[in-house]
Amino acid sequence: MNQRNASMTVIGAGSYGTALAITLARNGHEVVLWGHDPEHIATLKRDRCNAAFLPDVPFPDTLHLESDLATALAASRNILVVVPSHVFGEVLRQIKPLMRPDARLVWATKGLEAETGRLLQDVAREALGDQIPLAVISGPTFAKELAAGLPTAISLASTDQTFADDLQQLLHCGKSFRVYSNPDFIGVQLGGAVKNVIAIGAGMSDGIGFGANARTALITRGLAEMSRLGAALGADPATFMGMAGLGDLVLTCTDNQSRNRRFGMMLGQGMDVQSAQEKIGQVVEGYRNTKEVRELAHRFGVEMPITEEIYQVLYCGKNAREAALTLLGRARKDERSSH
């Protein structure tokens, strides 16, 4: 591979970053995958697979591993960031001085900035300036299924139409990976944060033993909360009926591959927050997202009762069953009301 001729550099060698890198490479593109741990990258190079997360999926020949950040960023103008939301800004500040002058940045990170609750587009603009084209991909994607080449569909939004077109062409694979473009940059970002919160609630409901009726009601009312918050932020309500909204919400709330759902189930079964996090063993994005989404809702005056009760369980010690009873005991309302 020419040192400056890769189609994409992927920043983040966890399960999802690796799965996206495999997907791009399987499409015939030269891809560089960078990880912050040199020992981990050396292991990936040796094994030609990510044995920790995706042990049954060998790397295509066009997937190249790199532990030197400068070398990785020099390899391509297209940078795909796949890191947890709480380190997103830190990673962007780290890569900024090493990026090529023609660089374009897309992220698959789902969530909001830790502590501030800002959209990641605002974090990116602050870290990188106003000139660089930005994009986000989001949707119902479990890493194992994506890496295995099973049919998957996502949404893509960008500040730059040329970048959006290029990304759609790079990522789209007629056999397994369908990429829908969407001009709603805010909505595509927001859906991925709120669904993490609702998935914890769905897990709690199932952990308590409430059944399919309750789970479905929670998903539906969770979608209403997502849509209300999105409208307050200027998103297009139609976005939340697409891949980055309803699609991701249903997937994360109903399948046990979801860490957020499993975390919620443990809480519903009576486990404490810290023990549940330790048992999951990986980042549970919804834990931080709950606090951030709640703060964002308060800032914009949006009522989100499900989010509020999940916050009470995670941060105030409320019992999951008590939280559920609080929701069930709310005053009667018109289903179409804004609260």
Swiss-Prot record:
PANTHER family: GLYCEROL-3-PHOSPHATE DEHYDROGENASE (PTHR11728), GLYCEROL-3-PHOSPHATE DEHYDROGENASE [NAD(+)] 2, CHLOROPLASTIC (PTHR11728:SF1). InterPro entries: 6-PGluconate_DH-like_C_sf (IPR008927), 6PGD_dom2 (IPR013328), G3P_DH_NAD-dep (IPR006168), G3P_DH_NAD-dep_C (IPR006109), G3P_DH_NAD-dep_N (IPR011128), NAD(P)-bd_dom_sf (IPR036291). This is Glycerol-3-phosphate dehydrogenase [NAD(P)+]. Belongs to the NAD-dependent glycerol-3-phosphate dehydrogenase family. Gene3D superfamilies: N-(1-d-carboxylethyl)-l-norvaline Dehydrogenase, domain 2, NAD(P)-binding Rossmann-like Domain. Keywords: Cytoplasm, Lipid biosynthesis, Lipid metabolism, NAD, NADP, Nucleotide-binding, Oxidoreductase, Phospholipid biosynthesis, Phospholipid metabolism. Catalyzes the reduction of the glycolytic intermediate dihydroxyacetone phosphate (DHAP) to sn-glycerol 3-phosphate (G3P), the key precursor for phospholipid synthesis. One of its GO terms (molecular function) is NAD binding. It comes from Escherichia fergusonii (strain ATCC 35469 / DSM 13698 / CCUG 18766 / IAM 14443 / JCM 21226 / LMG 7866 / NBRC 102419 / NCTC 12128 / CDC 0568-73). SUPFAM superfamilies: 6-phosphogluconate dehydrogenase C-terminal domain-like, NAD(P)-binding Rossmann-fold domains. It comes from the Bacteria. Its EC number is 1.1.1.94. The active site is at K195. PROSITE patterns: NAD_G3PDH. The keyword NAD applies.
